[in-house]
Amino acid sequence: MKSFLNETKELVTSQGLIAVLAIVQVRIVATSLGPEDYGLIGIYLGIIALCFRILNSRNSDLVLINSKSTDKEFIKSAILFEIILGLVSCSAVYAIIFLFPSNNFFNFTSTPNYLFLFIFTRIFFNIFEVFRGILTYKGDMKTYSFVESFSNIVRFSFVVILISIDTSIKSFFYALSMHQLLVSLVIFILLLKNINKQKASISFVDYFKLSKLNFYKIRTDQGIGLIPTHLDVVIIGYFADFYSAGIYRIAKKLIDPINYLIVAFSPWMLNKINEDKRYNFKKLTFKILFPIAISLIIFYYFFGDTFIELIAGKEFSDSYIPMLILLVGFLSYFLTFWTRHFLFLNNLIFKHTIGRIINLFVFLITSPYLITNFGFNGIALAVSIAIIFQKIYEF
């Protein structure tokens, strides 16, 4: 336990700071805009995030594998690769928007400028995955944690400042756009400094050939899993209303600290498995993860309603039940988060992909019925049931 804390303290501190900033940001945005506008933001972010992350999510793993597979320098090629993927994703978002220009679901008849700017700046933010992969390979968790913290502090600051000046959805997306531009610039500079000029460089074509097989594996795995992750708010907005989307989104946001723990432990876990294929997961689960899970259950069950009122206000009090339902699913994933990393580094990622297909299938089958009958509680139930089915299969 002591060695675990020593090895993960920078990551845990970083993600702890990020979680606190995220919760405070939720309070500022949700209380300022109310459930309907907060739900609408979730719908916009869900569609945009899906289009980008379906090509970019976990590409840090691709960079990690490539670092082990070649002695040549490839950072410049990796940056170009991510920018091209960003352009493809950007085109996909615009295509979706233009396909439904007069659809009331988006609550606009023509695409606002703030969304165009946010989508455009998101292209460059893709290179963050290159940075994560390089530092995970080097085991430099201190710099990794510092940059993650810096990124979230910048985002928090821009959101707070612009929302305080003008309480609107427009201000929120302008803040996110400014954050993406500034952080992308910083990441770009840091990546250039990490280039080893003593090594021979790999061309973009050769980098693509090196990446192709593992890229397809990661994309299949991530693409399937991202649909319930990012479209849940969109689906509740479609089958119910923006108010229900807002209530559910608050429930999900307040459960997000569990994801921050997973993010904190993941680079460390990847590094450990990379060094020792026989790492003792049983000891990790029962001595570290399980006590954390019990503490979270006690907190959310006994103090969850107060937590919601403190963070989002009384108008979001309906978020308590969906929050508890989501807690069950999220903790199921937390206790077994290491399975994905073990399967990935042992060339068994296909099993995780099958697990995600099961997750997606269960989610798509159950969510329309459960939402129709139970509203925001129904979408939370669909998400948790899907996660549990996935984890049962992977075990």
PLM ranges: what are they?
Residues 43, 112, 116-119, 145-195, ...:
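Hydrophobic alpha-helical transmembrane segments
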Residues 7-22, 148-151, 155, 172-192, ...:
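Transmembrane helical elements of multi-pass membrane transporters/channels
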Residues 3-57, 90, 94, 156, ...:
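Signature of the first transmembrane helix
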Residues 53-71, 136-137, 255-278, 342-345:
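Helix-loop junctions and terminal segments of transmembrane helices
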Residues 6-18, 44, 49, 53-100, ...:
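Membrane-water interface segments that mark the loop-to-transmembrane alpha-helix transition
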Residues 100-118, 302-334:
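Interfacial segments at transmembrane-helix termini and the short loops linking adjacent helices
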Residues 7-18, 72-76, 115-120, 135-160, ...:
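Alpha-helical transmembrane segments of multi-pass membrane transporters/permeases
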Residues 38-42, 46, 115, 242-253, ...:
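Small-residue hotspots at the loop-to-helix junctions and early N-terminal turns
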